[in-house]
């Protein structure tokens, strides 16, 4: 196809197109982050009522990632297409609803911008390759999972498990690791945090993390192979400890306040996939091993 040939031979055009795509995807991720937990809660309630033998709730209006159309949470004004252009509409509207002038949350444009910038970097890092396409899907998934976990302390299986399988499929073709390394990465990724979970619970009687974290690290191992696991665990622990203390201080929260670990795993895994080899070599040279 002429367009694909053009993008393959013009790296800058590929990066710019990927940034624009990232803006659109970022807008959709805002919808996913807002609606998916509510959709899951609806399903849980329906399943609980069925298990308890209760009458099902009256049929509710359709609620999914497509319907109903997005609306202002304050006045209910339905957002029109020209009011939903990523970043542009937010700036044109001055960050306010066109109807009631209520402030629009700053996180919406920030998510769009972050998705665009990360997507552009992936395109620049990998070039016009299958690796770039796969890494874009992973990046978008990690962003959505991180935000949902930060809001609800929840890592949805509907996001984690498909990405785990996608990582194994990608590495069937050797995009990031061999298939054997990816399989071991998935197994060891799950078992490593599972072991820490039970050891911590035996010692303290408390649950230090959720099962979603096990699955997330297994998913990252399926993408990068078992070799990225030590660096991912180390980076996520360091970043989580530092930011966790800062967040507790800022919120004046108690030390027992739960802190989602998923975002730190996602950040660390993403870094390990892109720069793991360079970070490891630099550390070994600094430590005098090479």
From Swiss-Prot:
This is Prepilin leader peptidase/N-methyltransferase. The gene is pilD. It is found in: Cell inner membrane. Belongs to the peptidase A24 family. Zn(2+) binds at residues 72, 75, 97, 100. It catalyses: Typically cleaves a -Gly-|-Phe- bond to release an N-terminal, basic peptide of 5-8 residues from type IV prepilin, and then N-methylates the new N-terminal amino group, the methyl donor being S-adenosyl-L-methionine. It comes from Pseudomonas aeruginosa (strain ATCC 15692 / DSM 22644 / CIP 104116 / JCM 14847 / LMG 12228 / 1C / PRS 101 / PAO1). Its cofactor is Zn(2+). Gene3D superfamilies: 1.20.120.1220.
